[in-house]
Amino acid sequence: VICKVYTIQWDSVNYISLATLTGRVVSFTRVSQYTKHGVIDKMQRVLVAGATGYLGRFVVKELKEQGYWVRALARNPEKLNRLGVFREPPIIADEVFVGEVTKPASIQRLCDNIDIAFSSIGLTRQKDKLTYRDVDYQGNKNILDIAVESSVKKFIYVSVFNAHLYEHLEIVKAHEDFVRELQNSGLNYTIIRPTGYFSDMSEFFNMAKSGWVFLLGNGKSQINPIHGADLARVCVNAITRDDNEVSAGGPITYTGQEIAELAFAILTKTPRIIRIPSWLAQAAVKAVRPFNKQTSDLIDFFVAAGQGDAVAPKTGVNTLADYYQELVPGIRTR
């Protein structure tokens, strides 16, 4: 029996491992790990739920760069190797777990040997008649129950900024009802509250491409949206921090008017902006509700949020102008 130490290079991470050889490898045991962030004596294992979403993809990437072992939960594993529609990176995880959070039987072993659970699960454009209650609350509750049973050390969850202002809306209430479940679970936890993703701001870009941007209200409400890569760093850093809540925004604060004008400028188009009064937007919500409650709830949230500021502590380096520039060369953003 011959013992040798091998170094394997994976992306920016070196894994220092001890292999026992008898002409071929018969066991492979990790003994320590070196990354650009220093030495980690024991590689922590992290579950990422929502891995195929905008933020989740960046979280997987950041976790790997910081030297964590990653299990990615995916409903559709075929999405993992593709570049996301908002320029998110493909997913390179240590393990892929195929399951659906709304089907507890499919995720029973999800947290086996997991130290940290992260979830950015939320209802987006799914077309299977699920509700915000089904996904944002119950789906995350299903993960939490398994995390508690598996003695996970910490649970990190992405909710909504200024949620207390919008809990009368089902999309926010579902998130915050889960937050209360997490707070009462007995687990260590961190709630991440971003102001808004750059992917959300792509809607302004899409409208500008079509020639017109529609703004709710007077366009003076302020927001400092954040890039997925910058927010992912906040999420991953929360693993080793004691904060129970972290609010995060990007480095630059804009008004709605300024975001619209920026989109037109990047596209080298003449700004054409139509302002929609709040009363008219609310009328649209009521008109849509009998036919599609999910869509009306989402519009209702954006109408309410668009009437107030969403400015959180600034972090990150990525600007909305740079992000819009990436979208120019024929990239689909829907």
Predicted feature residues:
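N-terminal Rossmann NAD(P)H-binding glycine-rich loop of SDR-like oxidoreductase domains
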Residues: 46-68
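NAD(P)H-binding glycine-rich loop region in Rossmannoid oxidoreductase-like domains
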Residues: 78-82, 87-142, 146-149, 164
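Glycine-/Pro-rich loop/turn segments that contact NAD(P) or position catalytic residues
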Residues: 123-209
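Substrate-positioning beta->alpha
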Residues: 139, 217-239, 244
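Glycine/proline-rich active-site loop of Rossmann-fold NAD(P)-dependent oxidoreductases
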Residues: 199-206, 237-246, 269-271
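Glycine-rich Rossmann NAD(P)(H)-binding loop
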Residues: 216-221, 246-254, 264-268, 276, ...
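Terminal hydrophobic/aromatic helix or amphipathic segment near a protein terminus
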Residues: 258-307
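Amphipathic terminal alpha-helices
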Residues: 305-334
